[in-house]
Amino acid sequence: MKPKVIVIVGPTASGKTSLSIELAKKINGEIVSCDSMQIYKDMDIGSAKPTEEEMQGIKHYIVDEVLPTERFSVARYKQEAETAIEEILQKGKTPIVVGGTGLYANSLIYGIEYNDIKLDEKYREELMNIANTPEGLEKLYEKAKKIDETAMEKISFTDKKRIIRILEIYKATGKNKTEQEKESRKNEVKYDYKVFAINIERPILYERINKRVDIMIEQGLIEEVKKLIKKYPEFPTAMQAIGYKEIVEYLNDELTKEEAIEKIKQETRRYAKRQITWFKRIENIKWLNGLDETQNNIKIILEVMN
């Protein structure tokens, strides 16, 4: 029998962190992060990284892993996450995978082997330059749509990073991302993943998101971005993240402070909507009510696990 691994996904601001920490305390678990921004060092406020205090002594893996100047592929994530899961199981503890990055979650749940594709940096630069011109991103979006319509259904027309990624993969391999995923799903899945998703009524979730953004600003998000720019003048991938790119636009006088804050809220709400759509496609997923008592959701998780 394959070892069981708990996976908790959900949109941003749905309460994944607090639920997972309470669960870990109850069942002697450790947490494997499934978040493409919390892997970066020095990007704490904007990525809603749990603080030492919030972690309550529970060990977290794949957090503060790389510098914002480094690229971190899905292939690398899968490898590191499986190593962490194995390490947790060896200790006789329960692994709990937690986060909102659908691509990371899928790589584990479906055993998708994303080969570490050697990308053409020059071509990426070319695409970045086009994306930064008026209507350039729109043109790239249309081009990517012709290459891989299925993958583009899940990608927003403003998501520069992922649009460019679709084009890069095709240029490097001659195959689109969807074809590659189909081929790579033939692998045996290592563990018995029990997947739970947190659901919250849209208006309440959006209210939480707006509030969270205000708190991030109060906590010093603008200062965090200033420090990042000073410390890492070249960190294009990390800077495409929601909450960071808008503050950069504000610091470059492209937006007022109020406009930047409003844009972060709007982009985060859109992202949450895409996350929910993504998680709905996961087979055998068990939905939890995010407004329920934490202990009640823990009870539901444990019933499925036993």
Residue spans for each PLM region:
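Phosphate/pyrophosphate-binding catalytic cores of soluble transferases and nucleic-acid-acting enzymes
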Residues: 1-306
